[in-house]
Curated annotation (Swiss-Prot):
Tagged with keyword Methyltransferase: yes
Active site: D118
Coiled coil segments of this chain: none
One cellular component term from this protein's GO annotations in UniProt: tRNA methyltransferase complex
Pathway assigned to this chain's UniProt record: tRNA modification; N(7)-methylguanine-tRNA biosynthesis
EC number(s) stated in the UniProt entry for this protein: 2.1.1.33
Alphabetized InterPro entries for the sequence: SAM-dependent_MTases_sf, tRNA_(Gua-N-7)_MeTrfase_Trmb, tRNA_methyltr_TrmB_bact
Gene name of the encoded protein: trmB
Protein name: tRNA (guanine-N(7)-)-methyltransferase
Keyword Methyltransferase in record: yes
Purpose: Catalyzes the formation of N(7)-methylguanine at position 46 (m7G46) in tRNA.
């Protein structure tokens, strides 16, 4: 399959991305909808989830991506490999996350990852960053106790801001105040491999959803 070419940066606040998506019937998507679910927000070409779904078939995987051609390409590859625990959806996470979380069976979402999100360096563009207080609150409300949120970036400013947003939500507890020395997941992303091959740092943090008082 030829590699799909897309723009690297997509403005999630543009008018074309302000239509709330329709979520599928999850019982029709996954062979076993009772498995724990890993949600990857901003999955790009989906190669990370493709490897995870193969390595950990006891989990279901859902990738959200705002660039629709990448979603179509990733789902085609998943179908070719007959992976019934993997699905990708075209979505603007800042708009669609709450409806998505409401659509899922209660308690199945056990892990969320946000990896190397678009940094949007210019100050006037920072409101386009995916991790906003509203996203954190939505996850805190939906995730069961013990669920994990894994964050990583090669941009210190972006990683620090993401961690600040999650640390400000009392229902999340960071596992370690220092950056994690290694990725706790068994599969690296394509971006992670590229950064490490250049011997550049990757900043990682893990948050756990705390039990209700």
């Amino acid at each position: 399959m030829a590699r799909v070419r897309v723009r690297q940066h997509v403005n999630p606040l543009s008018q074309k991305f302000q239509v709330v998506t329709t979520w599928p019937d999850w019982q029709q998507v996954y062979a076993d909808c009772d498995r724990p679910l890993h949600l990857d927000i901003g999955c790009a070409r989906g190669r990370f989830l493709l490897a995870m779904a193969t390595a950990q078939p006891e989990w279901n995987y859902l990738g959200l991506e705002i660039r629709e051609p990448l979603v179509d390409e990733a789902n085609a590859i998943a179908r070719e490999r007959e992976l019934t625990n993997l699905y990708y959806h075209f979505s603007n996470a800042n708009l669609d996350l709450e409806p998505l979380l409401r659509s899922l069976p209660t308690g199945i979402l056990q892990r969320v990852s946000i990896q190397f999100p678009d940094p949007w360096f210019k100050k006037r563009h920072q409101k386009r960053r995916v991790v906003q207080p509203e996203l954190v609150q939505a996850l805190a409300t939906a995730l069961p106790a013990g669920a994990e949120v894994f964050l990583q970036s090669d941009v210190l400013e972006v990683q620090a801001e993401m961690c600040e947003h999650f640390a400000a939500e009392p229902r999340f507890q960071r596992t370690c105040l220092d950056w994690l020395p290694e990725n706790p997941l068994p599969v690296p992303t394509e971006r992670e491999i590229a950064v490490q091959n250049k011997q550049l740092p990757v900043y990682r943090a893990l948050f756990i959803r705390q039990p209700a008082d």
